[in-house]
Amino acid sequence: MLALAVTVLAVSANAASFKWIASNIYGADGNKYAGEVTLMAYAVGDTAADAFVAATATSSDAGAVSYTFSNDSLVGGTSYNFFFTATQTIDGKDYVFTSAEKQNIAAQATQTPNVSFGNMATATQAAGAWTTAAVPEPTSGLLLLLGVAGLALRRKQK
């Protein structure tokens, strides 16, 4: 029983040690991930938005809406902003963004473009919530086991 208590103590002491290291992040193709492009999409007629310029009209009639942007070179680690503005309700699942340079704004630039803004809601309709759940600390179970082992040893000695 004493050997078990010593083993539990050694395991719990080892479980408390950890090592922080920094390493490269690799993409699905095995190349190092150099940077991330964050794009917030806003469409404004013939207006420059960061490095992107709307080259066509941005009317949103009853049909499909399409925008063409020029000067759209994406740089890793950079944020770009677009503004989608409209006076009527727009169904977000109808919007798709692809770059003429075949860059996927949601992944690495080497991947095929397949970006869509699906099931979007306006700020007045969307609500965020932060929920947490109680999770016991990993060593608390081991400490409980060590305490029960100590009580068992004490009871055995009496």
Short names for language-model regions:
Residues 152-158:
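C-terminal membrane-anchoring or membrane-association module
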Residues 16-134:
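Mature extracellular "passenger" or substrate-interacting domains of secreted, surface-exposed proteins
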Residues 1-16, 127-146:
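Short, threonine-centered small-residue motifs that mark membrane-proximal processing/anchoring sites
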Residues 149:
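Conserved Rossmann-like nucleotide-cofactor binding loop
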